[in-house]
Design a protein with these regions (language model features):
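Short, intrinsically disordered low-complexity segments
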Residues: 143-169, 214-229
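Short, thiol/selenol-centered motifs that function as redox-active sites or metal-ligating centers
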Residues: 111-122, 129, 167-189
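Active-site/pore-lining binding-face segments in mid-to-C-terminal subdomains
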Residues: 196-261
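Thiamine diphosphate
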Residues: 191-193
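Sec-dependent N-terminal signal peptides
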Residues: 4-13
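Non-globular targeting/processing and membrane-anchoring segments
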Residues: 23-163, 240-378
Length: 378
């Protein structure tokens, strides 16, 4: 019975499309080719929105004592995130990063479940492509669980969000453990939490699989799902947005095993790129293929020093600006320090401060941002 409820919960939205327009049906079956700007009936799965409200502490339906306590805690934490991270970033973005508002499609490799900062820095995107090693995850019906299990899940979810809320990034080692549990089983959970807290409505969530031509098909086998597609929109907007999350190894060897993703990326054409707390993987030879896609297909790139090394950026971008401070890397990544990048930060009178701290250099009270633009495309 629970299995039946789960299938109805996850795929009820598919049945809803049978009574929609032919355009909506076509888009449902081949979601990677859906144009967010096309005016077509929005397909809703109310259970997906209800789940998003519940895990984000915004539901008015659960009045249990345990949930009300979780709700109060979530509200308090969110207020701190807004005051300490979001508002300072918004002020900085609007003052110094105006071109990001022109970006409609964003690629965020090594993202984990970090929808929050992608959305804050790039507020107008219609399409968000997120990639990480962590599993995509699946939803469940909260009411199908005993109260102790629901409370255990919410406690574990809060724990998994700690580093993102406090430091501005997810720790890879923590995610490996925290997002591979029975209920908290992938990045879908932090993504949905941040979507709801950011004021978005979840229209539907579709487990999916890549096809050889780089398109996506809805997958009924959630145990083997490699990706999730989330359709969402802002209150008061008619435009529907789409988020793709892929669980893929972006190393050269990993991409050889998943050529369909490489084709998917090529099919996207030009996009903006966001990189943060990326473990300096793009500094390393085994990640040269994905680095090449980033350099070739990006119109604008916003990153910290853990992203693409400066020596590669200089050959592809017409304008490179730096913000914040860059004097060192943490000991774990000391070998990736860039003296050439430090020289760009040398004139502190000309380099604007960020007014916020996110990323690896928390212990030094430093944040660095690199903003690169191809003038011919913006």
């Amino acid at each position: 019975m629970k299995k039946l409820l789960f299938l109805i919960f996850c795929f009820g939205c598919i049945a809803c499309t049978t009574s929609g327009s032919s355009q909506a049906d076509k888009n449902q079956n081949n979601p990677s080719k859906e144009d967010a700007q096309v005016s077509s009936p929005v397909v809703m799965n109310p259970q997906h929105q209800a789940f998003a409200l519940w895990i984000s502490g915004l539901s008015t339906q659960d009045t249990s004592a345990g949930y009300l306590k979780y709700q109060e805690s979530s509200n308090n934490i969110w207020r701190k995130v807004v005051a300490g991270k979001i508002n300072p970033i918004l002020n900085f973005r609007d003052s110094f990063l105006a071109p990001v508002k022109k970006v409609r499609k964003l690629f965020y490799p090594f993202s984990g479940g970090d929808f929050l900062y992608a959305n804050v820095f790039f507020p107008e995107i219609d399409t968000l492509i997120m990639v990480g090693l962590e599993p995509p995850g699946s939803l469940f019906i909260p009411d199908s669980l005993p109260t102790p299990e629901r409370q255990s899940y919410l406690s574990k979810l809060s724990q998994s969000l700690f580093f993102s809320n406090e430091l501005g990034f997810f720790r890879t080692l923590s995610m490996e453990k925290e997002l591979k549990q029975i209920r908290l089983n992938g990045t879908l959970h932090p993504i949905v939490f941040y979507l709801a807290r950011s004021g978005y409505q979840i229209n539907r969530i579709l487990p999916s699989k890549l096809l050889s031509d780089g398109s996506l098909a809805v997958s009924a086998d959630t145990s083997r799902t490699q990706s999730n597609i989330i359709y969402y929109q802002k209150a008061g907007e008619t435009k529907e947005r789409v988020l793709y999350y892929f669980s893929i190894d972006l190393s050269d060897s990993g991409l050889k095993q998943t050529p369909a993703f490489t084709q998917f990326l090529k099919n996207q054409g030009e996009f903006g790129v966001f990189l943060k707390a990326a473990s300096y993987l793009l500094h390393q030879a085994p990640f040269s293929t994905i680095r090449g896609h980033i350099l070739e297909q990006s119109s604008v790139l916003l990153q910290d020093d853990s992203g693409v090394p400066l020596k590669f950026l200089k050959n592809q971008f017409d304008d490179i600006q730096v913000f914040g401070e860059y004097t060192q890397t943490i000991p774990l990544f000391a070998s990736f320090y860039q003296p050439e990048l430090k020289s760009l930060f040398a004139d502190s009178a000309k380099v604007r401060k960020t007014g916020f701290i996110i990323g690896y250099n928390q212990q030094f009270r430093q944040t660095n941002l690199i903003f690169a633009k191809k003038m011919r495309t913006l």
